[in-house]
Each structure stands twice: as C-alpha cells, then as structure tokens.
C-alpha cells in the first residue's frame, strides 16, 4: 500500500520530526511511504520529496518566505501548488496523509485545497487522513470552518495524544462534531533508549532553537543557584539558533556548562540526565515522558501561542513536571523550579500511551481494509428475510 505524507514546518522542526517518525513506523509495517516536506531541509531528517521550501517570517505565521528569505508571491504559490500536484499524481498513492490541516496551516490552503480536491475526484478515491498533535492553537472563531473542511475532505482524524492527559476538546471545542472520524493514537515518539551508567547531567534544550534563547541563557545563569550546581549542565541551542544568539550564549560558558548546537544522541542524553529544562513542544515532552525524567517546562507563549502552555499545565497538574510561565522566567524563578523538580519523584511509567507511531500505522491499515472490503453477499432468501415464521 502506498502512503503519500505531506508535512509543512514553518518555524521549528517538531512537525517534520514527528512526520519522519510516523513515516518510519509505516514503512516498518510494510507501507511504501512518500514523505513530502514543504519546509527547510533539516540535517538528520530524510524526506523523499523536498518542495521549494517555505518558512514563517515571524511568530504570527501569517507571512511566508521562500528559501532566499523573500516574501512569496502568487507566482511562487502557483509553482509550488503545481509541483505538489505533480508528485501526488505520480505517486498513485492509496492513502493521503496531511499533517495538521485543517486544524492549522491555513496559510497553505493555496496548495492543500487543490491537492484534496484532486484526491476527492479520483476513482477509486484514496483514503484521506489528517495527522494532528495532541493540542492545537485554539481558534474558536474558526472551528465551524475547520469541521466543515474535515467532513468534506477527510475520512479520519488521527490525534497523536492520549485523552487521559489531553482530550482534543481541551484545545478544539468542536471535537464532538467529528465523532466517528476522530481517533487517538497515543503519543508519537521514536523507540526508547535504555539508560546507561554515567554522570547524570542537567539537559537544557529549546527544540530547533528558532525561539528559546532567553530560556537557555537563564538556565546557564541559574545553575550556580540550584541543588544541581555540581552536575554538568549541557545546553543544546538548536540547529535554527542564529549565529548572533549562539555567540551571546557562549559568553556564559564556564566550567560545568557545555554548550552545543545539537546532538544526534539527544534521546540517550535525555534518558541519562538528572533533570531536563525545556520548552513544552510536543516532541520534547513525549521524549521526556518516555525517559521518565524530572523536568522543568517553560512553555513558548510569544505571539499569542497557547499550545505549549496548555500541555505544560496538564503535565504539571499530574505531577509529571514543574511549569514556569515564560512571562515569569527569571534566573531566580528558574532556579527555584529546578530545585522543586529535583526533589520531586520521577513521572509514572503509565501516565500516557507512548505507542502512537505503531498504532498510527495499525489504524491506517485497518481503515484501508475496511474501506476496500467487498460488500457482503446478499442473503439467498432476499434482503427482507427476517427468519422463519413461528
């Protein structure tokens, strides 16, 4: 079975990373996957088709830039939409998976609506699924339109979360309108890494690094005020951290603090750390829960973003992490949060379902089989037969 998987990351790398994990799980289950990315290429993440990349100009996500940093125009959009349709038609896919839309990525409607319309017109029509994270940016004024688009174009909506922690209606109030289409998969995370012996470090990270330098700087300054000041603090700035910001962070490096851009063995570092300090992006949180490490979460909240704040609040309510609002981020407050987290127990192993990648592949297989199951043969006695008369 052939799966065409579309993903567009605009600022961070979380969407692309999750899509790559899902693509790997689908291949492990025997699917032939074409992973199509519309964002900037990322080292260490392989895709099958790279469209002309687009990124967000700022935290509002309303303006798109091309790979030269120029505003995209209508001609660029037409070329990109045509390129996407070309690779879609060439794939002859049985399943179309679209990441986030219609729950986000409205700025990509210029290419997604033609893609979905094309899929709708095909005979036989492919299975069409939406892949969406546990919590989305809440936009109540757009929910009716989102439901209409989901009903028109999508057979199923796969929510990569666990309702025991975050029911989808916590961020999308009209979730009940999609009853029958909406399915929870559990959290999507790569295979677990077993902890190894060694000095336990404090791991400080900010995802891809496009935002979060203030958190990293605050952590470097907070170290000496914490119970964990004797440990090495490893700070990962991220591949998207600007050169200017990285140089500014280097000024705070001292014995006991290691600063790097990224590590391919991030999962192993996390599994072995004494404590994690991070934002509350989907992938980092899922990996933190998988590793069962003590954590301080400082959710990204600039530009009116609410997704990470809700996720961090839900985890803090369960005692799985300490939360510090970005607006309250100071060296003193962060040090206090680190000390509270250091004294706290580790998160429970059964807090959430972390088998989302495998379950997604399983569900897509089930949906495809049900869609293509031949109709039952009619009864020999005719459709109105009700059984023998008494």
Please describe what each predicted stretch is.
Residues 39-40, 265-309:
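A donor-sugar binding/catalytic signature common to diverse glycosyltransferases
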Residues 7-20, 212-213:
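A short, glycine/small-residue-rich beta-strand->loop->alpha-helix junction that serves as a flexible
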Residues 23, 172-174, 187-275, 309, ...:
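Donor-nucleotide binding loops and adjacent catalytic segments primarily
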Residues 1-12, 98-100:
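Nucleotide-activated donor-dependent transferases that construct or modify glycoconjugates
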Residues 3-6, 25-75, 79-81, 86:
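Conserved nucleotide-sugar phosphate-binding/catalytic loop shared by glycosyltransferases and other
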Residues 336, 340-390:
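C-terminal amphipathic helix plus adjacent low-complexity
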Residues 110-184:
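Active-site-proximal region of nucleotide-activated glycan assembly enzymes
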């Amino acid at each position: 079975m052939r799966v065409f998987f579309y993903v567009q990351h605009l600022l961070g790398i979380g969407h692309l990373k999750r899509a790559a994990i899902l693509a790997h799980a689908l291949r492990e289950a025997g699917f032939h996957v074409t992973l199509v990315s519309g964002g900037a290429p990322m080292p260490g993440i392989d895709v099958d088709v790279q469209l002309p990349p687009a990124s967000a100009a700022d935290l509002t996500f309303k303006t798109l830039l091309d790979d030269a940093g120029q505003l995209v125009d209508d001609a660029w959009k037409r070329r990109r939409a045509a390129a996407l349709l070309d690779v879609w038609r060439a794939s002859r896919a049985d399943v179309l998976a679209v990441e986030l839309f219609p729950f986000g990525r409205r700025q990509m409607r210029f290419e997604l609506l033609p893609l979905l319309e094309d899929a709708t017109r095909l005979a036989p029509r492919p299975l069409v699924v939406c892949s969406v994270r546990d919590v989305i940016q809440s936009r109540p004024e757009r929910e009716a339109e989102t439901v209409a688009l989901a009903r028109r174009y999508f057979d199923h909506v796969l929510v990569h979360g666990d309702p025991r922690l975050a029911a989808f209606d916590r961020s999308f109030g009209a979730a009940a309108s999609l009853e029958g289409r909406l399915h929870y998969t559990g959290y999507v995370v790569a295979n677990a890494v077993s902890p190894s012996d060694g000095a336990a470090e404090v791991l400080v990270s900010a995802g891809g690094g496009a935002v979060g330098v203030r958190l990293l700087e605050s952590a470097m300054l907070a170290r000496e005020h914490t119970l964990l000041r004797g440990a090495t603090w490893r700070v990962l700035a991220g591949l998207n951290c600007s050169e200017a910001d990285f140089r500014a962070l280097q000024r705070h490096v001292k014995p006991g603090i290691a600063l790097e851009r990224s590590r391919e063995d991030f999962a192993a570092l996390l599994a072995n750390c004494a404590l994690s300090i991070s934002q509350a992006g989907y992938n980092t949180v899922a990996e933190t829960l998988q590793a069962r490490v003590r954590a301080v979460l400082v959710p990204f909240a600039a530009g009116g973003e609410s997704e990470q704040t809700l996720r961090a609040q839900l985890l803090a309510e369960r005692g799985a992490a300490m939360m510090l609002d970005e607006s309250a981020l100071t060296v003193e407050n962060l040090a206090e949060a680190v000390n509270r987290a250091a004294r706290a127990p580790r998160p429970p192993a059964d807090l959430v379902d972390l088998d989302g990648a495998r379950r997604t592949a399983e569900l897509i297989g089930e949906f495809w089989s049900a869609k293509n199951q031949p109709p039952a043969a009619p009864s020999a006695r005719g459709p109105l037969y009700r059984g023998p008369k008494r």
